[in-house]
From Swiss-Prot:
Residues 7-18 have a biased composition (Basic and acidic residues). It comes from the Bacteria. This is SPbeta prophage-derived uncharacterized protein YouA. Residues 1-23 are annotated as: Disordered.
Length: 203
């Protein structure tokens, strides 16, 4: 690669800061992600690599000469943090009934860019097990919130979705609120059993 200077497993940028020091230094080691693709004119190639060292080898398999340019810096995205909070671990919601759960996302998880909720059941009669779940935003200075009195701000997460045993339902929250009120209704013809609800935050 003409744009890099090699010293063993250490590669440095062929460009320097004017005093002989390379502008960037990278360590490229053994390849663990083999990749063979076709390059199109003026279309960049993006590859996602997670926690992996990589070696860049370019081979021209075409029948004509190909000019490959390294015109953009390698960009990395690191998941800074992730947190979960178990709202309920093994709850039961009777047929046609609704249960409510209030969670302060900031107190339970911290401040994150993205929040979500996951629901899980050990329900065995999955064909008749359905769930209707909605979420409401709540001001932090209100200790309890009644969805029946202020239902105009709700966001429906799952609308009479079949709850399959050992298969989680998950939804990213479409809004960010410091405090949420989650309502879960057994919308099928059987009780919801073994209900587990987890809220999560991710940066």
């Amino acid at each position: 690669m003409a744009f890099l200077n090699q010293d063993g497993d250490k590669y440095t940028s062929a460009k320097d800061d004017g005093t002989g020091n390379p502008i960037t230094a990278v360590s490229i080691e053994r390849s663990t992600v083999p990749l063979e693709v076709g390059l199109n004119n003026d279309q960049p190639l993006n590859v996602n690599v997670a926690n992996t060292a990589l070696d860049v080898n370019i081979t021209n398999t075409a029948s004509v000469p190909v000019l490959v340019k390294n015109t953009a810096a390698i960009k990395t995205q690191v998941q800074k943090s992730y947190s979960e909070f178990v709202v309920t671990d093994a709850d039961t919601v009777a047929t046609g009934a609704t249960k409510s759960y209030t969670v302060d996302l900031i107190d339970s998880l911290g401040v994150f860019r993205t929040y979500g909720v996951a629901m899980y059941t050990t329900q065995t009669d999955s064909s008749n097990s359905k769930v209707l779940a909605s979420i409401y935003s709540v001001p932090k200075n209100i200790p309890f919130y009644s969805a029946t009195t202020s239902g105009n701000d709700n966001s429906v997460l799952f609308n009479s979705i079949v709850f399959v045993q050992n298969y989680p339902l998950q939804k990213q929250l479409t809004f960010t609120a410091p405090k949420i009120h989650l309502t879960v209704k057994a919308a099928g013809t059987v009780d919801l059993t073994g209900l587990k609800i987890v809220v999560w935050g991710m940066e």
